[in-house]
């Protein structure tokens, strides 16, 4: 039986049975591994997929909320700005929707990019957000558990980095729960709305994580 994302991708399993990890039941349907096929990871409650223009209404509403913006250090956009930004993210293929499996409604987003803290190593930088009404339900833990396994097992990264604003205690706790280690503390990392913030630096190494 194929259980890991890597095995499922190789074996082409379409309807794998659920299995338990840390008391949480997970399901994986990795339609994307290579060759340009759309990415589609399905967990117990969520789908992690490529962004679409159909996500505009939810992206504009959630992504412009004070709750999300306060830790992204970004500014509100009008509807046309949100549309252009969404189009840009779709084209760049570095951003993925966290969607409700029940109705495919976007509830958050995952972003990956080059790890600028490291040089000439197989590492990726991870960022994420979730709409306020979807927090405290375990959704981000569920989404990142699947996505991290995808990055290690399918994309074969050796290291994942994440930077979190010092006031964002909940995000730091989430990363630690997922096995990330704090590697550093960057004082006076950025200025947002005339406030200077520090960044907390985290990383997770593939050889420290047991595959799902």
Residue positions per predicted region:
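Acyl-donor (CoA/ACP) binding surface of acyl/acetyltransferases
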Residues: 31-67, 95, 99-212
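Short loop/turn motifs at secondary-structure junctions and domain boundaries
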Residues: 87-92, 180
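Cationic, low-complexity basic patches in intrinsically disordered or flexible, solvent-exposed regions
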Residues: 26
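Conserved GNAT-fold acetyl-CoA-binding loop/helix
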Residues: 67-87
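Hydrophobic residues within membrane-embedded alpha helices
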Residues: 3, 10-12, 156, 165
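Glycine-biased, low-complexity coil/linker segments
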Residues: 20-22
């Amino acid at each position: 039986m194929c259980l890991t994302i890597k095995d499922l991708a190789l074996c082409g399993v379409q309807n794998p049975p659920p299995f338990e990890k840390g008391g949480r039941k997970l399901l994986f349907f990795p339609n994307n591994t290579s060759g340009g096929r759309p990415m589609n990871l399905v967990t117990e409650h969520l789908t992690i997929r490529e962004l679409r223009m159909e996500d505009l209404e939810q992206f504009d509403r959630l992504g412009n909320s004070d709750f999300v913006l306060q830790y992204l250090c970004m500014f509100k956009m009008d509807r046309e700005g949100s549309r252009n930004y969404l189009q840009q993210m779709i084209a760049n293929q570095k951003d993925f929707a966290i969607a409700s499996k029940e109705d495919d409604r976007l509830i958050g987003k995952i972003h990956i990019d080059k790890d600028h803290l490291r040089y000439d190593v197989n590492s990726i930088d991870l960022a994420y957000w979730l709409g306020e009404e979807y927090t405290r339900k375990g959704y981000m833990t569920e989404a990142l558990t699947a996505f991290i396994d995808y990055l290690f097992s399918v994309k074969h990264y050796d290291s994942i980095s994440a930077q979190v604003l010092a006031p964002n205690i909940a995000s730091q706790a989430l990363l630690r729960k997922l096995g990330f280690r704090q590697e550093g503390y960057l004082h006076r990392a950025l200025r947002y709305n005339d406030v200077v913030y520090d960044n907390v630096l985290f990383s997770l190494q593939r050889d420290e994580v047991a595959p799902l």
